[in-house]
Amino acid sequence: LAASEANLAEAKKYMFYQTIGHDKLNQLRHVRFFKDINGMREHMKKHAQILRPKFETVISVLENELGGLGIGSWSKPKGGYFISFDAMEGCAKAIVAKAKEAGLIMTGAGATFPYGKDPKDSNIRIAPSFPTPEELAVAAQIFVLSVKLISVEKLLEK
């Protein structure tokens, strides 16, 4: 704030009473939009109808391509916006990098950990909510190929 000493002193009087807190106007917008808890539940059902097929696409590709191979495991969420994928220890960053080489940009490996530091370098958060179903089908294939390539490299190190 650029002002004279007198104007700064005056502004400080008013700013003194400001608090950091919840955005009350945004809360009011939500209350008016949803009306009540049932309105929110109905709205979230609409979200689920949009997101469910996307999650099913990714889970299906993971199960068909990686199921039973012992090189990864994943969550099957019944809500939320992410699938948690656990690769072999020491592989997550390399998998995300390999996917990026093929044009797939993902959330950074270990993003679910404080400061993004996964001590096992194994966790990858998959967010299937944004891409179209067509893009997601291609992205899931790129991801599983990246998992397979990096896992083979890791196994050959032993």
Where would I find each of the regions flagged by the language model?
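Residue-level detector of anion-binding/catalytic polar loops
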Residues: L104-I105
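Conserved core segment of the aminotransferase class I/II
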Residues: L1-R52
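Short hydrophobic/aromatic beta-strand micro-patches
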Residues: A2, S84-D86, A127-S129
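PLP-dependent enzyme catalytic core of the Aspartate aminotransferase-like
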Residues: E101, K117-K158
